């Protein structure tokens, strides 16, 4: 039986990241596409996002509308990117070199590595907090934050060192267990804390745009990971099946969690992971320790993903070190950032991660335009910096300067729109259309060139 077969360790050398997966190793079962896009969203983040809608002034009707629209908008590019993995056999960053060139892929790859380190820290802060509370209940002793965090970070690092097969196994088997546990927690919390949120007035257009942008970014953030976990599928796998399974995984985890956050917002003191953890623990009653254990474990599925993809991205950025060393460096930096930022979690989330995600929208716009509308005639990969790479850089900087909304900086267009953040949409469509109309598409490429 497949679940009794231990996962094999991925190649440890840097060269393995830039090469396509050998055909004899492309044996991944297609159901893993669902789990690899489903399990990383299992955690308090979705609950926080749903609860945040109420603090923005949305009632249940508009909150539900924002959840559906935002998740579809954010998940569709990720699902479309997943279909690039089987025929190329490449990681998502390496696959984008057909549009950006070997040199042009380095800036987004480096940004993705930074992004993964940031998410590593964001996921681990509430997980370590939950682990400390769990141990104080069951063992009567609360370890210091740095130690609880170190235990989780070590487990995540080991999984990422082992590589693709181990990460996929965690997504499926640990993910299934977390799904069952979170279902019980969700039903229990909804039973005790459901109060449909009401608002005195319908939200304005600016508020709805901001809410949809936040929700879209929740799934869009996975766009730079997607084919990392589909490239081991056989090359002839129908792309439609890959897209639908990835879409089902993303929407099947994000939408229910955010709706529960919306429904239980009244019982949450503030839209933060710590407040969500406390609220869920209280609502669960005797199941409180299970809530804490599940939240702590949920960080392993998410951060094994982050650490593994980060190791690929660091190598794609031109840092030619063994994959195992790249994974260790990533985990250590994520650990340090989590320890340093634990006391200012909200600022870490908004000021660091939301702004850095502005590069993802134009990058994936170019990648999808190239893959679905470009010429796939086999030619060598562009060796240097393409016009597509220039478009990526220009649009990324322009959308941050004009459209971003954060505590660090608010662009003039965002101020004019009353704080509404439409930079993701503008960046995606402007980059995709500019790339498509500029004639910048390379006339095909060869994955192993």
Language model regions located:
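C-terminal membrane-solvent junction of multi-pass transporters and transport-like membrane proteins
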Residues: 20-24, 177, 364-436, 441-449
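Juxtamembrane transmembrane-helix boundary signature
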Residues: 66-100, 109-122, 436-443
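Hydrophobic transmembrane alpha-helices that form the core helical bundles
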Residues: 105-139, 299-316
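Selective recognition of specific alpha-helical transmembrane segments in multi-pass small-molecule
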Residues: 43-46, 69-77, 112-123, 177-188, ...
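Membrane-interface "cap" regions at the ends of multi-pass membrane proteins
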Residues: 1-60, 207-213, 231-241, 441-449
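Transmembrane alpha-helical segments of multi-pass small-molecule transport proteins
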Residues: 109, 137-162, 176-187, 215-226, ...
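Membrane-water interface regions at transmembrane-helix termini and the short interhelical loops
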Residues: 55-56, 83, 107, 129-139, ...
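Hydrophobic, membrane-embedded alpha-helices of multi-pass small-molecule transporters
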Residues: 30-47, 186-192, 201-264, 285-304, ...
